[in-house]
Regions:
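Hydrolase active-site cap/lid region
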Residues: 2-50, 72
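Serine-hydrolase catalytic core
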Residues: 33-184
Length: 184
């Protein structure tokens, strides 16, 4: 959640007047996805920001006091092209503060087979590389991706805590037909 979300409440102020009731929503769009709401209320944005800000402050405070040692392992599944939750923020605000306790982030790469190439931005092809640890980390960094650009078969590339080299394991599973990104 960006820092600008703290101002979301201002966008809803006109909603106190009946002709401007729609101002209570940041976006109102048709609801076609049974697994996710498409419309988003201003109060939802404000509450999301407040919760995220409080959690980040608490994580940073506990990390500085070296009190995260008793935290159970954290397991996160994330698509590298998910724009709802920032993958770099997960890595910097959460995982960079975690102790070596068995935590793992699992990132789903885009389906790199040629049939989807026209749909993807060039930045999509380097997202995993930009997110991979450049120095040993305290958590396992795992990606699920195509075995290569010509294959629909997937592999797991996993960098163990304290390491920089990925171990590759074939999953013997293809990307589902017609899917260009696996997500949450």
């Amino acid at each position: 959640i960006t820092r600008f979300a703290r101002f979301a409440g201002l966008a809803g102020l006109p909603a106190v007047l009946p002709p401007f009731a729609n101002a209570a929503w940041l976006s109102v769009v048709p609801e076609f996805n049974p697994f996710k709401y498409n419309s988003f209320p201003v109060n939802g944005a404000r509450q999301s920001y407040r919760l995220t800000d409080a959690l980040q402050s608490q994580i940073q405070r506990l990390a500085r006091a070296d009190q995260l040692g008793s935290l159970p392992p954290v397991l996160t599944f994330q698509s590298v092209i998910d724009f709802t939750v920032s993958t770099p923020a997960i890595l910097t605000a959460l995982y960079a503060n975690l102790p070596d306790n068995g935590s793992e982030i699992v990132l789903f790469d885009v389906n790199r087979t040629l049939k989807f190439a026209p749909l993807l931005r060039p930045a999509s092809y380097v997202a995993i590389d930009r997110l991979a640890p450049t120095e040993p980390a305290t958590y396992r960094f795992t990606t699920i991706a195509n075995a290569n650009d010509d294959s629909e078969m997937t592999v797991e590339r996993s960098i163990a805590p304290g390491q920089l080299q990925a171990a590759v394991r074939p999953l013997n599973l293809p990307y589902p037909p017609g899917i260009f990104s696996l997500s949450h």
